[in-house]
C-alpha cells in the first residue's frame, strides 16, 4: 500500500465527475493537473451522463437557461480564457446545436474510461479531447477524430475506440452516472475529496487547500 513519504498517509483519492463537453473542465485542466502533482493525489476521471443527472440534481443545462444567464456564461468564459491565457472558442464549430443527438459527447468519455481501464493515465487524453472541441475546432463526436487525437497524445487510438462500447466501459459509465447522482453532482466538473464536493474550476483553490490540510492531518 502506498503512503505519502511526508506523513505516512495514504495518497488522497480524488474523483472528477465531468463531461467531455465542459469548457470549464478544459479551462481547469492544467490547474487540476498541477494540484494532483503537488499533492501526489490519485486522480480518477469519471465521465458521466451529464444530461441525465443534472436536471435531477438541481442544475440547469445551458440550453434551457434564460438568455441573461446564457450571455453571462459566455462573458465568464471570455474572462477566464483571458485570465488563464488559454485558447478557447466561445462558439466552437462542433458544439452541438439543438438538433444534434443528446449523446454526442458520450463517446469521448467512453474513450477516457477505456484508457483508464487499460491502466493508462488518461488525463492527457481527456485534456486533448476537450482542447480539440474548445480550442481546435475538431469534431470529437467523430470516431476518426478521436482516434487521431488519441494517437497524437501517445495512446493507441484504434484500440481505445474499439473499447468504447465494451461491456466494461459501459458499466463504468453507468456506475459513474449513478454515483454522480447519489453524491448530488449538479454541474461539471465536480471534484470529490473524502466525500466533499468542489464544483467548478473556480473552486480549485479550495481543493488545493483541502489537500494541504489533509496532508497535515488537520480539518
Model-based region annotation:
Residues 20, 27-133:
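Structural alpha/beta surface segment adjacent to cysteine/selenocysteine redox centers
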Residues 10-16, 20-41, 124-219:
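C-terminal cap of thioredoxin/glutaredoxin-like
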Residues 2-12:
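Extreme N-terminus of proteins, especially the signal/transit-peptide cleavage junction
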Residues 6, 73-74, 149-152:
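A broad, low-specificity signal for short, low-complexity segments enriched in glycine/proline
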